[in-house]
Swiss-Prot record:
Lineage: Eukaryota, Viridiplantae, Streptophyta, Embryophyta, Tracheophyta
Cellular localisation: Cytoplasm; Nucleus
Similarity comment: family membership: Belongs to the peptidase T1B family.
Originating organism: Oryza sativa subsp. japonica (Rice)
Protein name: Proteasome subunit beta type-3
InterPro entries xrefs: Ntn_hydrolases_N, Proteasome_beta_3, Proteasome_bsu_CS, Proteasome_sua/b, Proteasome_suB-type
Amino acid sequence: MSIFEYNGSAVVAMVGKNCFAIASDRRLGVQLQTVATDFQRVFKIHDKLYIGLSGLATDAQTLYQRLVFRHKLYQLREERDMKPQTFASLVSALLYEKRFGPYFCQPVIAGLGEDNEPFICTMDCIGAKELAKDFVVSGTASESLYGACESMYKPNMEPEELFETISQALQSSVDRDCLSGWGGFVLLVTPTEVKECVIKGRMD
């Protein structure tokens, strides 16, 4: 078993019209044994920027703490929040710096940039970025997430439709992966508000 599959995970981000949504499952397991059913994988950097960390849970939490530290230093120095593109470069550099003993994480970054333009990207454990204009996925359920997102995604979705689409894609995907699931957590971010929602799924 790959170390990336040890805890199980499913993270997906999707772009709409001047908005984005990022979602994850809530299961923390040790291989096939379930340890927690309310585990957080999506973290806030600031009001318009979020990161989802799939992979090894301990590394995800350590990496998040280092990223918060770096972002707070940036805020003190620049007196403004980081743009999503800048933050993606920071995460990439941080991961590549540790390439010989990497954090076993695959980050998904989603944010609203200038003119409320949505930005999403993902990367591997050594910081190789993959930018997208529609959706990005990571985690043990990534294969089924790709299929679900490709069949359900439409460009320029309104926030309500985007929320429904990403929720359905996550739910149908984790049902096909025994290492992730136990409901989901969805964040919908528009220029004026942030909507958080816990969705119920199959609890097995």
